[in-house]
From Swiss-Prot:
GO terms for molecular function: ABC-type transporter activity; ATP binding; ATP hydrolysis activity; ATPase-coupled lipid transmembrane transporter activity. The keyword Lipoprotein does not apply. ATP binds at residues 369-376. It is found in: Cell membrane. It is a multi-pass membrane protein. It holds the Pfam family ABC_tran. It comes from Bacillus subtilis (strain 168). Belongs to the ABC transporter superfamily. Keywords: ATP-binding, Cell membrane, Membrane, Nucleotide-binding, Transmembrane, Transmembrane helix, Transport. This is Uncharacterized ABC transporter ATP-binding protein YknU. It comes from the Bacteria.
Length: 585
């Protein structure tokens, strides 16, 4: 029950709804026990006692009881569903809010399919238990307690025979729960893996088809599907062994009751109607006991689901605002790195080692280096996507941890290497970071990003709906919309992380001309592999293996003849070869 205690904040606010549902269930359960009593009166008083004048009244009473039970059942079912639905609505919102707050380090290891499984299948499993299973557990206790009370009234010896069987049923139920809970946890994990395989395949379908790896993907999916099947078959074997055992114990009890009860009737120690009523009560009690396995099944599934949901809900948030964080509308944009080091994992080598530089407001800083050299790590630290393991980063002479995350990130416009567009209108995508932006602001941002012309050529212009991840646009078009989104934010600091890598040389040149105007009075970091993208920067930092190897302007670095010069020669060698005349012999 510890799992449900830790989830209490999500369902406890709706306890009044649940209590009303329980009240209706109490009435429904009490009426259920009235049926055998009416049956006993009919046999002993009307049939054997020949009081036929009571038949009409008993029939009317029986109809009234059935109507009352129907109404109680309706309210119990409706209010129970309302309790479950409202609880998981709150829970699902809490999960989604938590996912928004978790840092990049969590998503480095998380799998999309697994997260989707938790937010759908696991939440739904918990809802089903809250709506139905929890009330059934309570109903089971009530029905057994009320039935035993009436049974003791009819015959103490017969009731003791019934109670003698209960320990065997309790042991069977306990052992079933111990075996079925791990099995259902395995099912949840297998389903999450299956989800991940499907999600990865759909997301990477272009790669799969271009490399003709359909058969390989089918085989990996079949393997995951086979594991899921094996987990379900294991659970099925547990169920298959449990139900015959429960039925055998129940039937043994019934045979004992009929034998001993028949003897008591023959000895005139029990009326025939009382034996029939007693037998009906045993049936009413035995069915919930046998059905307890199904309820425990729901409980085990809900518990396994709850544990997986708590893995997210109780995950520590690495990057948060401190209690007295500064909230500012606009920052100046003076950036200072002081001996900053970064490691993405505890056992990994540092991605950055003792990096120091200054970027005053309005300056353009170029970050150049091979893949994995630490260029993008600088920008990820600046936006507090990750926290450094050493050193200090300041903006406007204050540590970035002094600012609220909202203040910091609303003043930093970022265009990542892989631009992500949402499945909404182009206008919504451009104004995503600034929802209150006017249409004029959106158009101005698009013009500066060289996106306005192709947007106007689309059938619905800025109201054109994009497909998932911007499907329907070329890579260059998506990148330009992403740049427009960053410009629309009107940030104090602009980060272009290989932002022009997906556009052709002519478009790159046009964007750079437009960005020169945008970069005025705005600190800009340009992360690039191509020297052409950042040679106009006020200072270029050349990274290699997490350290700054060289720094200076484009011309200063060329004159040094160092690492930067080697990169320059490699990138422009092909251009020189094309421009030189070749003899054709």
């Amino acid at each position: 029950m510890e799992t449900f205690k830790r989830l209490k904040m999500y369902y406890w606010p709706y306890r009044k709804v649940f209590m009303w549902s329980l009240l209706a269930m109490l009435l429904m359960t009490a009426i259920t026990v009235v049926y055998p009593i009416i049956l006993q009166i009919t046999i002993d008083e009307i049939v054997l006692g020949r009081q036929y004048q009571l038949a009409a009244w008993v029939s009317l009473g029986f109809i009234a009881v059935m109507v009352l039970k129907g109404m109680a059942t309706f309210f119990h079912q409706y209010l129970g569903d309302m309790f479950g639905i409202k609880s998981v609505y709150r829970l699902r919102n809490g999960l989604y809010e938590k996912l928004q707050r978790l840092s990049f380090s969590y998503y480095d290891n998380a799998k999309t399919g697994d997260l989707m499984s938790r937010l759908t299948a696991d939440v739904e499993g918990l809802r089903f238990f809250l709506s139905y299973g929890l009330a059934e557990l309570i109903r089971f206790g009530l029905l057994v307690a009320i039935s035993l009370s009436v049974m003791f009234y009819y015959s103490v010896p017969l009731t003791l025979v019934t109670i003698a069987v209960l320990p065997f049923l309790a042991v069977a139920v306990y052992r079933f729960d111990k075996r079925v809970h791990p099995a259902f946890r395995g099912i949840r994990k297998s389903f999450a893996k299956l989800n991940t395989k499907v999600q990865e395949n759909i997301s990477g379908i272009n790669t799969v088809k271009s490399l003709s790896r359909e058969d390989f993907q089918i085989s990996t999916f079949n393997k995951a599907n086979a594991e899921y099947r094996a987990q379900y078959l294991q659970t099925s074997s547990i169920w298959s062994a449990y139900f015959p055992l429960m039925e055998f114990i129940g039937n043994t009890c019934i045979v004992a009751l009929l034998s001993y009860g028949g003897y008591l009737v023959m000895q005139n120690q029990l009326n025939p109607g009382e034996l029939v009523a007693f037998f009906s009560l045993v049936n009413y009690m035995m069915w919930p006991i046998m059905n307890l396995g199904f309820v425990i099944n729901m409980f085990s599934q809900a518990k396994a689901s709850g544990e997986r949901l708590l893995d997210i809900l109780e995950k520590e948030e690495d990057i948060t605002d401190h209690p007295h964080a500064l909230h500012k509308q606009k920052l100046t944009g003076d950036v200072h790195f002081k001996n900053v080091s970064l490691a993405y994992g505890k056992e990994q080598t540092n991605a950055l080692c003792n990096v120091s530089f200054e970027a005053n407001s309005g300056k353009v800083i170029g970050l150049l280096g091979p893949t994995g050299s630490g260029k993008s790590s600088v920008t990820q630290l600046l936006t507090r996507f990750y926290s450094p393991v050493g050193g200090m980063i300041t903006i406007d002479h204050k540590p970035i941890t002094d600012y609220s995350l909202k203040t910091l990130r609303s003043n930093i416009g970022v265009v990542l290497q892989e631009s992500f567009l949402f499945s909404s209108t182009i206008r919504s995508n451009i104004s995503y970071g600034r929802p209150d932006a006017s249409m004029e602001d959106v158009i101005e941002a698009a013009k500066r990003a060289q996106a306005h012309n192709f947007i106007m050529e689309l059938p619905d212009g800025y109201d054109t709906m994009l497909g998932e991840r911007g499907m329907g646009l070329s890579g260059g078009q998506k990148q330009r919309i992403a740049i427009a989104r960053a410009i629309c934010l009107n940030p104090s600091i602009l980060i272009l992380d290989d932002a022009t890598s997906a556009v052709d040389m002519q478009t790159e040149h046009s964007i750079q001309l437009a960005l020169k105007e945008v970069m005025k009075n705005r600190t800009t970091f340009i992360v690039a592999h191509r020297i052409s993208s950042l040679k106009h920067a006020d200072e270029i930092l050349v990274f290699n293996k997490g350290r700054i190897r060289e720094r200076g302007t484009h011309h200063e670095l060329l004159e040094k003849g160092g690492y930067y010069k080697k990169i320059y020669d490699l990138q422009y060698r092909d251009v020189k070869m094309i421009n030189e005349p070749h003899e054709v012999g």
